[in-house]
Amino acid sequence: MAVAIRLNRQGSKDRPYYKIVVVDSRARRDGRYIEQVGSYDPMKEGVNYTINLEKVDKWLANGAQPSETVNSMIRKARKA
């Protein structure tokens, strides 16, 4: 089973909110996920995401592939 770390859209029309989740790479965008590792609110000013780096590191060590957007967020979180 190929595993990915990507965004899962929540919220409502014109008010998006995303969960950063670990999923089977074949799953639908908003389908079932294995574990939630963070969240992202694009409407919020300033720091608008949270990531549990311990969980992310565990999944990356097990071969999970992050999406481009999530990979960018992980890099920014490591710098902070």
From Swiss-Prot:
Source species of the chain: Akkermansia muciniphila (strain ATCC BAA-835 / DSM 22959 / JCM 33894 / BCRC 81048 / CCUG 64013 / CIP 107961 / Muc)
Keyword Nucleus (UniProt): no
Keywords for this protein: Ribonucleoprotein, Ribosomal protein
Pfam families reported for this sequence: Ribosomal_S16 (PF00886)
Signal peptide interval: none
InterPro entries per UniProt: Ribosomal_bS16, Ribosomal_bS16_dom_sf
The UniProt record lists the keyword Ribosomal protein: yes
Similarity-based family: Belongs to the bacterial ribosomal protein bS16 family.
Gene3D superfamilies per UniProt: 3.30.1320.10
Protein name per its UniProtKB record: Small ribosomal subunit protein bS16
Any one biological process term the GO annotation gives: translation
GO MF: structural constituent of ribosome
One term under GO cellular component: small ribosomal subunit
